[in-house]
Amino acid sequence: MIKRIIITGGPCSGKTSIIDGLKDEGYKCFNEISREVIQKMNIKTSYKNIDFEETVFKKRKRDFLNAKIGVNFYDRSMLDNLAYLKINNHEIPTKFKIDCENHRYHPTVFITTPWEDIYTLDDERLESFKDSMQIFEALKQVYIEANY
């Protein structure tokens, strides 16, 4: 049986640290891929365009389909793209909605809370702490609306 478990949350809220710990314990984990895409697309602003979201969404769908028998952990999921599209005032493509409906993860989602004491910016983390809080709230809403 395949279990796909999501760990999500705003930027710099500890998701990747949790994923790294799970990897150390031998679990199959799928990394956050936004950083890689930000580097390749040379993005220098916290505003993400639809091309960025499309690229990230496709890679997250690929990761979903590449799950192995057993427990698989995901540093974010396809649903995160829906939250980011909403925040950036983009219309959510119908194909994104359909893929999210047809590719279900485990019903329990772990969402990390933004933590100002550990919050740092870098070349790929371009959102402010305030932005992180807005993203956190948007993520919660998207997952609730999707019945997680």
Predicted regions mapped to residue ranges:
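Hydrophobic anchor at the beta1->P-loop junction of P-loop NTPases
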Residues: I7
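A glycine- and Lys/Arg-enriched "phosphate-lid" helix/loop adjacent to the NTP-binding pocket
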Residues: N89-Y148
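Conserved glycine(s) of the Walker
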Residues: G14
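Conserved substrate/cofactor phosphate-moiety recognition/catalytic segment
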Residues: K23-R62
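Glycine-rich phosphate-binding loop used to anchor ATP phosphates in small-molecule kinases
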Residues: E54-R104, Y119
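P-loop (Walker A) phosphate-binding loop of NTP-binding proteins
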Residues: G10, L22
